[in-house]
């Protein structure tokens, strides 16, 4: 028998969108800001998500 295929990993943007849908805009924005704080840099993806998480 074959094993089930592995689930695809979510992109960062998809993860933020899911948080936005589940917990709301404020949570998604805080999640995005903390990601940049934890990696000690502001990446372009984080800025895109921060600007778009409330859309």
From Swiss-Prot:
It is found in: Cell membrane; Secreted, Cell wall. Belongs to the CYSTM1 family. This is Protein CADMIUM TOLERANCE 1. It comes from Oryza sativa subsp. indica (Rice). It is a single-pass membrane protein. The chain crosses the membrane at residues 24-40. It comes from the Eukaryota. GO terms for molecular function: metal ion binding; metal ion sequestering activity. One of its GO terms (biological process) is detoxification of cadmium ion. Pfam families: CYSTM. Its main location: membrane. The gene is CDT1. One of its GO terms (cellular component) is plasma membrane. Keywords: Cell membrane, Cell wall, Membrane, Metal-binding, Secreted, Stress response, Transmembrane, Transmembrane helix. Confers resistance to heavy metal ions (e.g. cadmium (CdCl(2)) and copper (CuCl(2))) by chelating them at the plasma membrane of root cells, thus stopping their entry and reducing their accumulation. Binds to aluminium (Al).
């Amino acid at each position: 028998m074959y094993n089930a295929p592995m689930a695809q990993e979510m992109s960062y943007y998809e993860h933020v969108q899911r948080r936005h849908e589940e917990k709301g805009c404020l949570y998604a924005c805080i999640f995005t800001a903390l990601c940049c704080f934890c990696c000690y840099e502001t990446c372009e993806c984080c800025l895109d998500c921060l600007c778009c998480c409330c859309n």
